[in-house]
Amino acid sequence: MMVDCQSSTQEIGEELINGVIYSISLRKVQLHQGATKGQRWLGCENESALNLYETCKVRTVKAGTLEKLVEHLVPAFQGSDLSYVTVFLCTYRAFTTTQQVLDLLFKRYGRCDALTASSRYGCILPYSSEDGGPQDQLKNAISSILGTWLDQYSEDFCQPPDFPCLKQLVAYVQLNMPGSDLERRAHLLLAQLEDLEPSEAESEALSPAPVLSLKPASQLEPALLLTPSQVVTSTPVREPAAAPVPVLASSPVVAPAPELEPVPEPPQEPEPSLALAPELEPAVSQSLELESAPVPTPALEPSWSLPEATENGLTEKPHLLLFPPDLVAEQFTLMDAELFKKVVPYHCLGSIWSQRDKKGKEHLAPTIRATVAQFNNVANCVITTCLGDQSMKAPDRARVVEHWIEVARECRALKNFSSLYAILSALQSNAIHRLKKTWEEVSRDSFRVFQKLSEIFSDENNYSLSRELLIKEGTSKFATLEMNPRRAQRRQKETGVIQGTVPYLGTFLTDLVMLDTAMKDYLYGRLINFEKRRKEFEVIAQIKLLQSACNNYSIAPEEHFGTWFRAMERLSEAESYTLSCELEPPSESASNTLRSKKSTAIVKRWSDRQAPSTELSTSSSAHSKSCDQLRCSPYLGSGDITDALSVHSAGSSSSDVEEINMSFVPESPDGQEKKFWESASQSSPETSGISSASSSTSSSSASTTPVSTTRTHKRSVSGVCSYSSSLPLYNQQVGDCCIIRVSLDVDNGNMYKSILVTSQDKAPTVIRKAMDKHNLDEDEPEDYELVQIISEDHKLKIPENANVFYAMNSTANYDFILKKRTFTKGAKVKHGASSTLPRMKQKGLRIAKGIF
C-alpha cells in the first residue's frame, strides 16, 4: 500500500499536552491498493488497483517551553513532525543559545548534569540501563541531530579560545557513542578550530548567535492555563532597534567591497537523513539538482584597448566605455554571487539583523553587511561615472547613461537582480534623474529599455512582477523575459552555460524583520511561538535555494575591471548633488524630460517619499484560524526592516522643488551616512525598493514610479514558493488593531519604526513603544508627544492620555512623529525631507481580530 505525498491538509484545532501546544490538522491522503499476485502476473494490476482515500490526524508543535521544544527534537526526528528538527536548528538562536540547547538535550537524553563552560568530561554519564535508556534507534536519532548540527551550523561551535560547547558535545559523544562516526567528526572539527590562528578563530566567530539574557526557570510564571512541570525559556528579544549600517564613506577614497573569511566547511561526511515534510520534499530535490559544479572557464582576454603606460611610467585611468557592457555585468555578477553565497542565512532573521546597530552588536552579520556594501558600491560607481567628469558634454554623458542601461540589461540576462536594481536606483537618483539635457540625448531605444527594466521593480500589486520573476527564474537555467538581449540568449545556448540567480537580499531582510515585528515571540505568557519560527524558516529556505543556484555561474574575474572598480572615487550625497547642479543649474533641471518620453513605469510619485508613507504588507504560509496573526499580501512590508533601511536626509537644495525626490548617494549633505541599499530597501515595503533620501524637495516633485524589488521565499530549500500568511497591515484599521510608523523629529534624518497599536493603547503606551524601538531608554514618555502627519501642512497632535487607535485620523497615512515637548503651542512640527517607501495600495487584505 502506497501513500500519496500530495495531500490536502485542513487545520481543525489545537491540543495542549504536557506544556506543549500542538496544531491539529486532518490530512487527506490517497492510498493505492496493491494488485493481487495474479493481477500482477497478468500485467493488469494498474487497471484493477483501487484508489482509496484516508484521513490522517497530524500534530505539529505550535508553541512550548524551551525545555519541551528541545525534548521534542528526538520524537520529531523519528517521524511525528518531519520538518521540526530542520526548523529548530535554523531558528533557535532567536530564543535561546547553543549552550542551553546542549544542556537540555544532554540532560534529557544523556541522563547527565549540564556541563559547565569548562566542559568537565567526568560529569557526563553513559545512558542508564535502569531507566530503560534509549535503544539504538534513539541513539541514532540523537546522533543524526547532532551530526546535522555540526555539518550545517558548525559556526555555532566556534567559540575561541576554549570552544566550550564543542568540547561539551565531544565529551558527550565520547562517553555515550564511543567509536562512532559522529565522534570522529566532532574531534575533527575541534582540531580544525583549535589549529586556526587566534585572529582567524575570532573572525570565524564574528557573528555568533546573540547571547540573550535568560531568566531562571524559578522566576518565570506558569503559562496561562498551562501547568508545565518546569519552564525553561528565554526572555523574548522583541522589537529590536534596527538602525542603518554605515556603508558608504564620506570622502572620496578607494574602498573595495570587504572580503569576508568564509565559515570553515564541515567535514565532508554523509549528512544525516533528516526527513522533511512532504510539501518540502520537491524543493529539496530541486535544490539538489542545482548543486552542479561550475564548469571552469579560461581567463578572459581583454577585447578592448587598455591605456598604455606613459613616459613617466603612469597609466591613464580607463574610462567606463572601454569596458563592454557584458563584461561589466559579468564582473558584477561574479562579485555579487560570491558575496551572496557567503551569506549566513539565519543572520537574516529579524531578531538578529535588526539588532546590528545596538551597542556590542557591531559584529553581527558581516556577510550581510558585505552585500550591502557591494550594492552601494555599484550604485556609487554609476553616479560617479555619470557626474565625475565635468568636461563631458550632455551628449557624451548620455552615452555613459546608455552604457549603464546596457549593463543593466545584461545583468537582467544574467539574472543578477542585485546589481540590476543598484544601477536602476542610481540612474533614478536625484543627482542623475534631474539632468534634463543628458536625458534628452539618450536614445529612444535605450530609454525604452530603461523603462522596461524599471517595470520589474514597480510597486504595482505589491511588486508582483519582481516576485513572479523570482519564482519563475529563481532556479531556471536562463532569463526568460523578452528584454533579454538576443546575443546574450544566443551566447547562453551556444555555450550551454547554466546560470544562477542573484536576488536582491533586501527583500528577504525586509520580510524577516517584518515577520519578527508582526508575530509574537511568546504565546500564553511563556510559551515560545514555534509557528513563527516555521514561517521564518520558509524565507531562509529560499535564500539557501538561491545560494545553491549561484554555484551555476561560471565567470572568470577580469583583473583590469576589478582594479578600476575598486579604485572608483566615492561621492557623498552633497558632492553628487553639487556636481549635478554645476552641470545643470536647478532652474534648468526638469523631471519632465522623463515624463515627456513616457517614463510612466519608472517610479510613481517620487514626491510621496518626502513624507513617511510606507506600508507594511506581508504574507507567509496561511494560518487561517489563528487570531494572533494578520492576513496580508505576499511578504512583509516595511517594518522594522525598513526601520533599519529607512534613512532620510535633510536635503541639499530646498529650492529645487521640481526635482524628483531621489538620491541614493552614500551620504547626506550634513554628513550623516546613508546607503543606496538601505534607501532602496525602503522604497519597497517588503523587499525594498529604490527609495531615496530626498534632497529636501517639496511635495511638488514630479511624479514617477518607485522601483522596488521583492520576492517570495519558502524554506526547507523549497523553491521560491508561496506564502500567504498572516501579518499586520499598514494604513488600515481592521478589528481592534493597526500598524503605525513612528519617526523621530530630527533635522538630519528620520528612521521609521513600525508599532502595533491596539484599541486599548493610550498615548503614553504607544510613546513608550516608540521610545523603546528608537533606543530612547533614558527618557520618559512624559517628555514626548505623538503627532500624526496628515499632509505637508496639516499635523494632528494626539492628546496626552487619548486612545491612539480612536484619536488618530484613520483616513490619512499612519505616519507619526515622536516629538520632544519643547515647541510652543501652535508651532508647526518640523518635517524634514524623507526617503520612505511609497504607500502601497491595500487590495483584498484584511486583518484578523485580536492578532496579538
From Swiss-Prot:
The gene is Ralgds. CDD domains: RA_RalGDS, RasGEF, REM. Residues 324-586 form the Ras-GEF domain. Residues 606-627, 665-711 are annotated as: Disordered. This is Ral guanine nucleotide dissociation stimulator. It comes from Mus musculus (Mouse). Interacts with RIT1 and RIT2. Interacts with OOG1. Interacts with TRAF3. Interacts with HRAS. Residues 613-624, 683-710 have a biased composition (Low complexity). Transmembrane segments: none annotated. It is found in: Cytoplasm; Nucleus. GO terms for molecular function: guanyl-nucleotide exchange factor activity.
